[in-house]
């Protein structure tokens, strides 16, 4: 099971916290402030991105940052506070690929408990095949399914998402696929 570094101080008042069962009947130990009694919940992080497509091709980005620097990925990253999942996916696509696109429907939702994350990918119809990648991307390039460097993909979530995208495309109907990644 994934665990982050333990919370040591209350975000509300700065006092120390103790891990214990809350008094409200919760069955999981939580970080509880010893002074103001604020309960601090530790939740998964959301990773949001897109499958940008142009005709028969999808857009992949070669990572210029760790982890997996030099590997290919879909444009994606951590969701920011104050944005919806689709807004975050659009922002990441703009930042990483410099692409022009129209957001479409949700394609995959993947729980990745071993790293404390949930990954959500939307389809995005490209409106141009000209890209201006940001500093996190070495190269942004279009690939057909046959051209994708499957052994050079950065993350299993990217591979699974691309497999669902192309299977749905062949079937002529897109759905939303929700599953766990062990």
Please provide the spans of the model-predicted regions.
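Short connector loops at helix/strand junctions that flank enzyme active sites
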Residues: 28, 45-47, 53, 67-69, ...
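Conserved hydrophobic/aromatic beta-strand scaffold that supports enzyme active sites
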Residues: 9-12, 30, 51, 60, ...
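Short glycine-/acidic-enriched loop or helix-start segments at secondary-structure transitions
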Residues: 22, 70, 152
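Acidic, metal-coordinating catalytic segment for phosphate/diphosphate chemistry
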Residues: 2-50
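Conserved Nudix-box catalytic region and its N-terminal flanking loop in Nudix hydrolases
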Residues: 53-95
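Unchanged
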Residues: 79-102, 106-164, 168, 173-174, ...
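Beta-strand-connecting loop/turn residues
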Residues: 29, 56-57, 129
């Amino acid at each position: 099971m994934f665990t982050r570094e333990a919370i040591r101080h209350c975000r509300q008042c700065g006092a120390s916290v103790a891990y214990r069962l809350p008094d409200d009947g919760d069955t999981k130990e939580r970080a509880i402030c010893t002074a103001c009694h604020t309960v601090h919940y530790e939740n998964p992080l959301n990773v949001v991105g897109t499958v940008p497509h142009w005709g028969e091709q999808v857009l992949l980005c070669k990572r210029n940052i760790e982890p997996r620097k030099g590997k290919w990925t879909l444009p994606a990253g951590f969701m920011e506070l104050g944005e919806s999942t689709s807004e975050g996916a659009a922002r990441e696509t703009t930042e990483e690929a410099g692409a022009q696109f129209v957001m479409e429907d949700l394609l995959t939702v993947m729980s990745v408990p071993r790293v404390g994350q949930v990954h959500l990918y939307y389809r995005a119809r490209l409106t141009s095949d000209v890209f201006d990648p940001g500093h996190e991307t070495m190269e942004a390039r279009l690939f057909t399914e046959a051209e994708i460097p499957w052994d050079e993909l950065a993350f299993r979530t990217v591979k699974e998402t691309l497999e669902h995208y192309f299977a749905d495309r062949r079937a002529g109907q897109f759905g939303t696929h929700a599953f766990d990644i062990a």
